[in-house]
């Protein structure tokens, strides 16, 4: 089974696999009919756009992204074409057990999530590569905030832009707390759809880069599992030869002993060898994050 993201989100896959497992073991007992369908959510979301609540969120994004850079300065191997096609590849590696343990301990110590710690490391990586101090990246957020949507299959994901202003005189500890606050505010204001935010900001669209951000991070914390007695199955990652953005960092954190790191990249901009180096530098940052936390950002030598 293969599904495009526009049709189904990660939570929907959990629901679908659960239903397959149920009917495989007990085909006679159907699930109750859901009182709410996806079209009800779509209509509600459409009507909500005009509400004071969404307008307030749009104003937040307008202030948060005011004068933000529209194009990342992350160096590429090839000149950006006038029309950037979505051809891409995925480089896959992993983050080892000792580093995973360290990341979990640091996140607990500083009262942040693993996601926030990974975002901080990625922002440092981008800063070191691009020399930019004002950085915007995208990240998807689960929009199942209402009980009625808990068991629905569909796409309940919105993408938000996380903006970080890096002061090289500050420590990574300070940056981590800044990212915590930025992430929490982004979640509070995540009901405003990305396309509505882009229109509200009057962002000019073009064919050679995505609006607002060109780098994304996606952290998946749960493993897709289906329980089928006496049946052997295997989940196979379905990498496609496409990339909607310059770089997308997919990090799977559900395994207790290692994290999987997949970097999807535009082959119109990057060589495979460069992506391997980027991955190694990112992992090196994570491996040494406990030593870097009290240091000034300008003193980092990870790239």
Describe each model-derived feature in a short phrase.
Residues 33, 290-303:
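A Lys/Arg-rich helix-loop hairpin that forms a DNA/phosphate-binding surface
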